[in-house]
């Protein structure tokens, strides 16, 4: 044991020297004692965005939390080293957030995929203990076997638990249960100092809160305890169309005010034929709606609300009746309400069906210049106008999601940044501009740069004018990050000093660039 530790330390020293050397010599798998450190791969330097490709010098495929602790413990103990480390979940970031230029990428999916359940009795909670590299789809598949499921989701499930908890994790259930970070009971985290810490709201709460929505800056999540609830067997899934933005948002706000009846609320802008039939693979209703989209100079756009009601077969709830009660209060376009009943699994896994369809058309592995923003309720109309001034509906490829969230479902002690709540509105919105740019369809370098420039303009203008904040944020400069955090910057930076003083973690976010051997704040 002792000998193994000494070997590991010596090997790590060689590693650090090799990474700091101008002549990188990691070309083949290296024996770093028990650490499975490998030469870089193309996967480690790419992500879903396909915009940035930063190559690390090595990849760690950890077999246990201890492997990560050894690596970080050694790097944080050596002021010699400038080596940075990024945890990589499923790599579904847009702007290289899980990349580490010339550093080490820790591939979280190499951790043994452990999922353990505790099923509470009547009146007790149920939960699952899962490794940080487990994907939500795996947790769903396993938990359904026990009739259970997490309460809060993302739209797409091929994302890791550690990856979404480092951001927030939102979807149509967020209005009811809060984001995924509001549904975690406990974490195991390896800090930037290499310490393995079990933390929760009552133990090492500051680390717990820092890591949730912490953009991978304070520690690597190796385990999480996720709250579960009874899973419905089926879901009644409804879509209703609107031709007026004010009516659309008013109805969305009505729906989120009825959490006893409604289980999911989202919505999207119908810009063109393609968005009208968005995710029609998963939503197999016969949509008999042929709107007039106007002309290029005078486009007409529409809106679609999606809501869902869970169907628990043993409860004998009449979901048809529940939908009827809800929809009677809505003001959608006449006859433009469609519904389908699908299994709970298919409902949650709906984006995977779209993925398979897009893959078969060669349209999945393209550039994704996405922009997500949290918008205060008071500014949602101006945000819509800003958006429409900066996109052309006739050639927009992708989806624009808009749906309301409720502030009081978010814990403001976590690291997540929301718009200031000056007006005390309980409602805020999330808007996701989920755009594809296909080089084979004429959108290569120049076109992509132009789309990114426009998104930056939207983000900057909406930030300055209406106090909107980016979700899954990307800021090219540290000063952009200072502005993003606003008055929360000091707390974020202080937590960094405490949990990752040598600025080793999360270099791809660009929040704390590592300058010459300085610890943050020194
Ligand atoms: P990665 O991209 O691998 O990592 C993201 C960040 O987290 C990086 O900074 C990384 O260093 C850090 N990180 C990763 N693992 C850990 C860990 N174990 N511990 C500490 N830090 C870690 N998001 C939503 O909220 N709602 C949605 O509905 C939604 N839908 C999406 C649909 C698609 C098709 C895609 C591509 C993305 C979607 N996202 C959504 C965004 C997604 O939640 C984030 O991009 C998330 O980071 C992806 O998880 P990942 O496992 O791929 O993380």
Please identify what each model-predicted range represents:
Residues 1-522:
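Noncatalytic alpha-helical scaffold of FAD-dependent oxidoreductases
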